[in-house]
Amino acid sequence: MIKTEEKYAQLRTIIPEMRRVKRIHFVGIGGAGMGGIAEVLVNEGYRLSGSDIAENAVTARLKRLGAAIFIGHSADQVEGADVVVVSTAIDASNPEILAAQERRIPIVRRAEMLAELMRYRHGVAVAGTHGKTTTTSLIASVYGQAERDPTFVIGGLLNSAGTNARLGKSRYLIAEADESDASFLHLQPMVSVVTNIEADHMDTYEGDFEKLKSTFVDFLHNLPFYGVAVACIDDPVVREILPRIGRKVVTYGFSEDADVQALNFEQQGYSSRFTVRREGMADLDLRVNLPGRHNVLNALAAIAVATEDEIEDEAIIRALDEFQGIGRRFQQLGEFTTTAGEVMLVDDYGHHPSEVAATIKAARSGWPDKRLVMIYQPHRYSRTRDLYDDFVEVLAQVDCLLLLDVYSAGEAPVPGADSRALCRSIRQRGQLDPIFVAEPEQLQTILPGVLQGGDLLLTQGAGNIGALSRQLADAGLQFESENQ
């Protein structure tokens, strides 16, 4: 067996180091995507530093790995850097960006750095409006089970690995491809996955859905002529663009014309069972440790990629069956005894109407007898404005709704696109009387009067609601007002 040190030495001969680059500085290092790329780079031996406005689990992990972490932004923090990597959330007036420009230090977006990592590897890039993180995690798990030892960069915590990024010793790199700013066009993978295409981040595409679709076509044409596009044919927009793709295409879905087709879907609580049919191969009866039809589609993408790479079926079966999930993707935080009775707490990152609808459907299918109580935090005023009617329709489908204020993500408020407006519009439908929660602290007094024994309490959104959900779990859903 080759020793670890020898394996890394072999890896360096395949993947050349970036010329002249010794120290890399990240601005906005605490984000999952930025932190994942940073973790791979620090493990490759680069000197790493980074800044963000607050500490979190990502910055703490990077600090343990030896990165220099600064809280707050200051011009002197880029001193000595050979390149500065910026997140899409960073404004051009940031003092570190201005200082880098003054010093003629190259400034690159995170996707450009990811592309550099992928340049000499066998890249698998996962794009789409929804399901990227879960699909990327499933592919990484299958490749790990098959002992392919991949490098991966994921937008969420892969529970089995305890991290969202890892430097492997093979030629494989599996990563999410971010369409939010069209920066996924920097990537040149060997395999590209498109899970679905819906209207989101439309400011990037000047409000033009045709431009968004064309950008996905361009992304798939970044594949070499011997590359493979793996596409969900159940999605109508993906199906629509397929005739424009001049590369080999493998389709997946529940549709009869899918190359990798799911049959006999059945949800059993947190897990899903289904049969996979592939042309010229034996059917596979599978269980994936994830709930919902949408997660079966994510699993099909992983199966399609693995099958194309001739990974044995046994590794696919084991990886899906033993999958331990991803942080904040229908993550069950526990069942707690409250004064009202037993309450199950689940946390989910979904923040687009289609994602919220899929989460609600999975909850209803897996736990049909439970009342569904949702605490929802809208993410970005622009998204709330652009998809307002869709949000009103989907949020009205729960049994009890508590709406936190919009998590702005740095955006200025948009009149008529806030949580108070959503409450009014949902109430006018006559199905539900939502509760507006101006400050998260108010949940201490509101929840005891809302929860009932047997409820499924779902915290939903992409802002800081994940931290709130963990606080609720840490407190065991016990509230100060109950003990007074």
From Swiss-Prot:
Catalytic activity line of the entry: UDP-N-acetyl-alpha-D-muramate + L-alanine + ATP = UDP-N-acetyl-alpha-D-muramoyl-L-alanine + ADP + phosphate + H(+)
Gene Ontology terms for molecular function: ATP binding; UDP-N-acetylmuramate-L-alanine ligase activity
Pfam families noted in UniProt: Mur_ligase (PF01225), Mur_ligase_C (PF02875), Mur_ligase_M (PF08245)
Subcellular location: Cytoplasm
Record EC number: 6.3.2.8
Similarity remark: Belongs to the MurCDEF family.
Role description: Cell wall formation.
Protein's name according to its UniProt entry: UDP-N-acetylmuramate--L-alanine ligase
Gene name, Swiss-Prot/TrEMBL: murC
